[in-house]
Amino acid sequence: METGLQFLMQKRNKNNSSKKIEIHQFKSNFFIGSESDFKLFNLKSFSKDDLNTENVTIIHFNKPPVIVPNKLFIKDNLNKYLSTNYELSNNLSVSYDETTNKLIYIVYEKKNNLETILNKKGIEFMSINYFTVIYEYLTPLKKNDEMSIYINIRNRLFDIIIYNKDEFLYFNTFNKKNKEEFLYYLLYVLKNFQADVNSTKINFLGKFEEFKEYYDYTSLYAELVYIKNNTQTINNIKHESPFFLNSII
């Protein structure tokens, strides 16, 4: 098993002809699939036959990561970075990813149970945090606005990512119970960056039927843009972060 984006780029070059399989690991379950064809699993229902490829990537969604600039990153301080945000879990391990542009490190907690099973079965895989995937997807995109706001809506949470032209500025994750709470946090962040919601475009990662009321509510205050899924998509398997059904790595 290896971690980090450098290994991801190597695997892309070496395994272009082999089928890529992604495992999206959440707190209580995980999804296995590729190219928008994913299935829900738990540890009891999982078998080696579900991974008939050598090109496997585990994407971890357990907890929001901590972003550390390259110049400030010290490997011995991994636990310290996370403990400033939340209490560390005894049953989770701490890992990190380095972005391909080497500007930031993504530090995060992850479950080891699935990785242990794959190692015992002799299945090679790479392991990466979900924000690393989003960062690597968004950073190369052409950004015409002075400030670009991206939102990844999830089941009970949402992520906000902000760029100043091509420079990454901000990432945070917020809980949400309803569209009003969602808009409150969004406006709070925009205010902190002195962004005018009436003139700032909000870029949603994907467009999914289950979040329609969030789109409609936000559209009352700002212009919306949908990244990747221009037409409304139904999340039939109740994926907790449906934008990742696009297999964007």
Locate each region found by the language model:
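Hydrophobic/aromatic-enriched cytosolic interaction surfaces used to assemble or bind macromolecules
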Residues: 1-249
